């Protein structure tokens, strides 16, 4: 019997880059096939070929033994293929029900029957075990909830081949377990699934087989992961040994740089109080909905502050906008880097130099293009940003390389005092994480106060000097590095009702 999906010698070339070179592997019906590799290795490019966004320059895609060409996303969908990318595709001002049934809403005489649509979607969501309000607009949902809408959309299409690109990157533990159950159900139902993830636990938990990409090539394939050590997968992914991904080293800390007292905002239930010293890395952990990102956006001036006080180096700090924050040396690398972190239509060099244009990189009234080019080239080399050249549009880079460019922007900033990192390694491979941690330590050595929000508990424990735990919109506790472990952090992160019930 023919494989449900086969890639046969797939090749793809972009200007100056061979993105894919001779990719060949099968995915059987009733199988979950993992794809692993560093950012920029070619995994997402392959899925874009499968989804009809790109056309291969060589090779072919076979579905149930038949060679297929997908000139558009619609052609891919019509062939029974669903691809869920990291960059979510939705209409923000439509409801959950309308997004899920987009293009096939039930109608009568040209009028959409919204009541029927909402009832149908509620029934399907309940059957999947997904807790979403069918009438809620996508704009009002969290990133995690929007991710679940995308996954549900593929399931409602009854696709035979489903590809998931980092599907749990924004999901809570409970939502991740719901997804895992859905994947297990789909496998039992005979669907063929491709699963891209940088999280080893997920690959070993879900995948029957695994293929490793590096620099656009297929470097290894494993028909089973039962006897494959994790160290082998890491070595195959990055081409080198990484003994300690965090490479933490203590630093000399300065005086208190940023201080928050009884800070309140629309999504913060109780006043938040904490300090961060110069050169210190303070990790913020909490479950989805704990209020971490909201607190950071209040500090940065992106959300309204309703109470409390901030000081910077002992002086009162009145921030009314993000521009105020940047002027005072406070910057934020946002969770949603594609929407809020990068200027997608601009080049890598322009994205790196955005902050520097306020000072230094001018020759009279004109931008000093030569110095901008030198600055961009220096950080591209320093941070190992994978790009054909500085003029490449940043939207064509992988997520990890986009994140490095955002960090380069602030490394180039001479007056930096506080760096807020919201999920800095979300959707990024182990090799790129290793390099980004190095950038974070470098900023701390410069005397910056670092605030790092992360949903990855090993990352928080591995990188932070101190850990602040949030739960239900308030700070639930604080742990020094020496006393922090997974159990202690999770006990603080669980809602009080859940903790009491467990007891």
UniProtKB/Swiss-Prot annotation:
Q: Which UniProt keywords apply?
A: ATP-binding, Cell inner membrane, Cell membrane, Membrane, Nucleotide-binding, Repeat, Sugar transport, Translocase, Transport
The record, for PROSITE patterns, names: ABC_TRANSPORTER_1, ABC_TRANSPORTER_2, ARAG
- List each copy of the ABC transporter domain by range: 5-240, 253-497
Cell location: Cell inner membrane
Q: Which SUPFAM superfamilies match?
A: P-loop containing nucleoside triphosphate hydrolases (SSF52540)
Binding positions for ATP per the UniProt entry: 37-44
Topology relative to the membrane: Peripheral membrane protein
- Which chain positions lie within coiled-coil regions? none
- Name of the featured protein: Arabinose import ATP-binding protein AraG
Give the reactions, separated by semicolons, that this protein catalyses.
L-arabinose(out) + ATP + H2O = L-arabinose(in) + ADP + phosphate + H(+)
